[in-house]
A protein has these predicted regions:
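Conserved hydrolase catalytic core segment
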Residues: 55, 96-137
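Active-site loop/oxyanion-hole signature of alpha/beta-hydrolase fold enzymes
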Residues: 57, 63-100
Length: 318
């Protein structure tokens, strides 16, 4: 019997890149896609919890961490990333058995593209809060928000962009969804972060808080290395992933045809925010189910054990 805590690593050559992937456990295949600037390390705790039931595969997306591109980085495409996923499924499930797929935030966008493009390779897809602005009541406001975040990065760097993101997505009393005005305000507030550093404005701490679990004790050397890798991915995410992925227009016809295999996840604490509003809007449009998860948009890092337990239930539901 395979030790579910043992990690088997490998490299997969895909069109234009080489993907680092990690596999734990045994059973039906479950592929877990990291979102934002995260890599496979974001799922270390959750993957170990789920590996008693599934063969859990995680990976570094192309252009991140240990998955180098063959050439210079350019704007990324959800469709290309979706095709990468199917190549990984083909490698790990050579008998053709379909796999379950989980994605959160930007990787939830990839999950939607994968289901639309390759429905026969997927048994169940859980897309947790895909920030697809096309599904918002005001798509232009959503596009403007993420464009403002990218511009903050171009003008003032990672710290300003992360502050703009946090400000733009923060709820205000009586407001249904955030907007670009507060993203710009957040960028201005972060402009003096170098001169007046605080925990809220420190770029590395902000990136760690966004992408990695807050440990109850000092991080191990392995955890520290993971945090550094994910922080180093932020420029690629902010320049080449954020706007192309949030601007993705889902294939509603294809998703409606596969709605029985699709679940849209929303955070208990983030249902009024842009990504959850988009998720619920998509569910209504295509007739897919909605499942509430612990925490907010980054609930998988806020409450990893509770999140894993909820994901286990959602994957097991028929």
């Amino acid at each position: 019997m395979t030790d579910r805590t043992a990690v088997r690593t490998g490299l997969l050559t895909v069109d234009g890149a080489t993907l680092h992937h990690e596999v734990r456990g045994e059973g039906p295949l479950l592929v877990m896609m990291p979102g934002g600037s995260a890599d496979a390390g974001i799922y270390d705790a959750i993957a170990a919890d789920l590996a008693d039931r599934w063969t859990v595969a995680t990976f570094d997306p192309r252009g991140y961490s240990r998955s180098p591109l063959d050439g210079p980085v350019t704007d990324q495409s959800p469709a290309t990333h979706a095709d990468d996923i199917v190549r990984l499924i083909d490698l790990l499930s050579p008998d053709g058995a379909p796999a379950a797929l989980f994605g959160s935030s930007s990787s939830a966008v990839v999950a939607l593209a994968a289901l639309a493009r390759h429905p026969g390779r997927l048994s169940r897809v859980v897309a947790h809060e895909p920030p697809v602005v096309a599904l918002l009541p005001d798509p232009e406001a959503g596009r403007a928000l993420f464009a403002a975040v990218r511009e903050a990065f171009r003008q003032d760097g990672v710290a300003a962009a992360m502050a703009a993101m946090a400000a733009g997505l923060a709820p205000e009393e009586g407001e249904a969804a955030p907007g670009p005005e507060r993203a710009a305000s957040g960028s201005e507030q972060a402009a003096t972060a170098e001169e007046n550093p605080t925990p809220e404005r420190n770029a590395e701490q902000a990136a760690t808080r966004e992408q990695a679990p807050a440990p109850e004790r000092a991080p191990t050397p392995e955890q520290a290395a993971t945090f550094r890798r994910m922080h180093a991915n932020l420029p690629v995410f902010l320049e080449h992933v954020l706007c192309p992925f949030s601007g993705y227009v889902p294939d509603l016809v294809a998703l409606k045809a596969s709605a029985a295999h699709l679940v849209l996840g929303v955070g208990r604490d983030s249902r009024a925010l842009l990504p959850a509003v988009a998720a619920e809007g998509l569910a209504r449009r295509v007739g897919a189910g909605v499942a509430e998860f612990p925490g907010g948009h980054i609930g998988l890092t806020e409450h990893p054990r509770a999140f894993a337990a909820r994901l286990r239930d959602v994957l097991a539901a028929t």
